UniProtKB/Swiss-Prot annotation:
Keywords: Chloroplast, mRNA processing, Plastid, RNA-binding, tRNA processing. The gene is matK. The keyword Oxidoreductase does not apply. It is found in: Plastid, Chloroplast. Usually encoded in the trnK tRNA gene intron. Probably assists in splicing its own and other chloroplast group II introns. HAMAP family: MatK. It comes from Lolium perenne (Perennial ryegrass). This is Maturase K. Belongs to the intron maturase 2 family. MatK subfamily.
Length: 511
């Protein structure tokens, strides 16, 4: 009990007191502008030519906010011309989006800084070096092979956006800032009603990615607060007594009251054990919870999460969003890989004096493969091939130059190999390379109105080199006369790269 109170107080100490006038200071917007430029987002979103995060533009918008005529014209304009109404509405929505993005940058800065604790004598490492998607799979290889059960969790979305605002009250105690956040959310259409479809969620993500990501991460970190505490204590809670742990605000009072009414009750029904074989991994909206123990214990964890979302976050989630399976007899789709931990036979030679024995044993090893059918399906949607995987030309790219077409196809191929380098079976990757390479050849042949064979003979080895992966480039430098086909199967081992900070675009629908 004392451990939870100390842990909770430590969590409360992270609450930020945002002074409302600071949102209107010029240096804050200059800092937000620089923060947006130097962030880990793609270059096409934050660039020096992007005027969305201009501090001068935001400052002018703040000044216009005080002008009542601006808001009157933006909201109430029944007698205006339709074209003028459209322009005013467009600019009003555009200004609101700029302000909400700037607000999200200012608010999320303290949360991002506290996630990077570092001693003063050491230089703070770059953010890109701290997070790699492939590092998750290295963790799975090291930890999951020793576990028995796996829960595949689809984290539900909150029913109403007001729940997200209320969750921020634990960390932000500045009421005007919360009202400003409500203003941004209510400025979108239909946000006063319940969100009942993923289409509305996607609309908010599309119009204001940074603000939605900040709210969603705040919600996820709040629910993981409970899970992290129980993970650190490795507590085993009976289902009948788990209701006393669900409401965080009155947690301590309920525990004290329950202890007075039922002295000695927790000694019999709640017991703690230190079990290091319990691991939790999350990426975006999917999470994996693996543990060792009995099926009954893992089912209790499942219902604990369901009750947590229901009583703590005021929305009910369906039990089918949490799939509990034996790790050795199931596979899970996570971050574009179809992974499993099968038991494989392994022969061990044992030497005893003059006699030797072969011992047949079973070992567990993480197996990661690429879902070929799904990837070919998304390649067909992008018009690189048919639904059956037959390569076709890309007519929309025929207006580009030859080297631009080669560069685009080669970059897509190298990115696929780079992201899926951890696949246990490379045959699927080479099939995808064949589709992209032949699609590129058909596109070039269509542009020049010739046959594929003629065009490939004219380009020669330069055409193949555009589709070389990083591993194949190393082999081509070592053996200059080696062709692509000769070392295709030379490197079937899995390789995890630690410079991948975002998921591949073709894998996003799979996630």
């Amino acid at each position: 009990m004392e451990k939870f109170e100390g842990y909770s107080e430590k969590h409360k100490s992270r609450q930020q007191y945002f002074v409302y006038p600071l949102l209107f200071q010029e240096y804050i917007y200059a800092f937000a502008h620089d923060y947006g430029l130097n962030d880990f987002e793609p270059v096409e979103i934050f660039s020096c030519n992007n005027k969305k995060f201009s501090s001068l533009l935001v400052k002018r918008l703040i000044i216009r906010m005080y002008q009542q005529s601006f808001w009157m014209n933006s909201v109430n304009h029944p007698n205006q011309d339709r074209l003028l109404d459209y322009k005013i509405g467009f600019y009003s929505e555009f200004y609101s989006q700029i302000l909400s993005e700037g607000f999200a940058i200012v608010v999320e800065t303290p949360f991002s800084l506290r996630e990077l604790p570092c001693p003063k004598e050491k230089e703070i490492p770059k953010f890109q070096n701290l997070h790699s998607i492939h590092s998750i799979f290295s963790f799975l290889e090291d930890k999951f092979v020793h576990l028995d059960y796996l829960s595949h969790i689809e984290i539900p979305y909150p029913i109403h956006l007001e729940i997200l605002v209320q969750l921020l009250q634990y960390r932000i105690q500045d009421v005007p800032s919360l009202h400003l956040l409500r203003f941004f959310l209510n400025n979108y259409s239909n946000w006063n009603s319940f969100i009942t479809s993923m289409k509305s969620i996607f609309l908010l993500k599309k119009e204001n990615k940074r603000l939605f990501r900040f709210l969603y991460n705040s919600y996820v970190s709040e629910y993981e607060f409970f899970l992290l505490f129980l993970r650190k204590q490795s507590s085993c809670l009976p289902l009948a007594a788990s209701g006393t742990f669900l409401e965080r605000i009155h947690f301590s009072k309920k525990m004290e009251h329950f202890w007075i009414m039922y002295p000695g009750f927790f000694r019999k029904t709640i017991w703690f054990f230190m079990d290091p074989l319990m691991h939790y991994v999350r990426y975006q909206g999917k999470a994996l919870f693996a543990s060792k123990g009995t099926p009954f214990l893992n089912k209790k964890w499942k219902w604990y999460l369901i009750n947590l979302w229901q009583y703590c976050f005021s929305f009910w989630t369906q039990p089918r969003r949490i799939h509990l399976n034996q790790l050795a007899n199931s596979c899970f789709d996570f971050m574009g890989y179809l992974s499993s931990v099968p038991k494989s036979p392994f022969l061990v030679k044992n030497q005893m004096l003059d006699n030797s024995f072969l011992i047949d044993t079973l070992i567990q090893k993480l197996d990661t493969i690429v879902p070929a059918t799904a990837l070919i399906g998304y390649l067909s949607k992008a018009q690189f091939c048919t639904g059956s995987g037959h390569p076709i030309s890309k007519p929309i790219w025929t207006d580009l130059s030859d080297w631009d077409i080669l560069d685009r196809f080669g970059r897509i191929c190298r990115n696929l190999f780079h992201y899926h380098s951890g696949s246990s079976k490379k045959r699927t990757l080479y099939r995808l390379k064949y589709i992209l390479r032949l699609s590129c050849a058909r596109t070039l042949a269509r542009k020049h109105k010739s046959t594929v064979r003629t065009f490939m003979q004219r380009l020669g080895s330069a055409f193949l080199e555009e589709f070389f992966t990083e591993e194949e480039l190393v082999f081509s430098l070592m053996f200059t006369k080696t062709t692509l086909c000769s070392f295709r199967g030379s490197h079937s081992e899995r390789i995890w790269y630690f410079d991948i900070i975002r998921i591949n675009d073709l894998v996003k629908p799979l996630n």
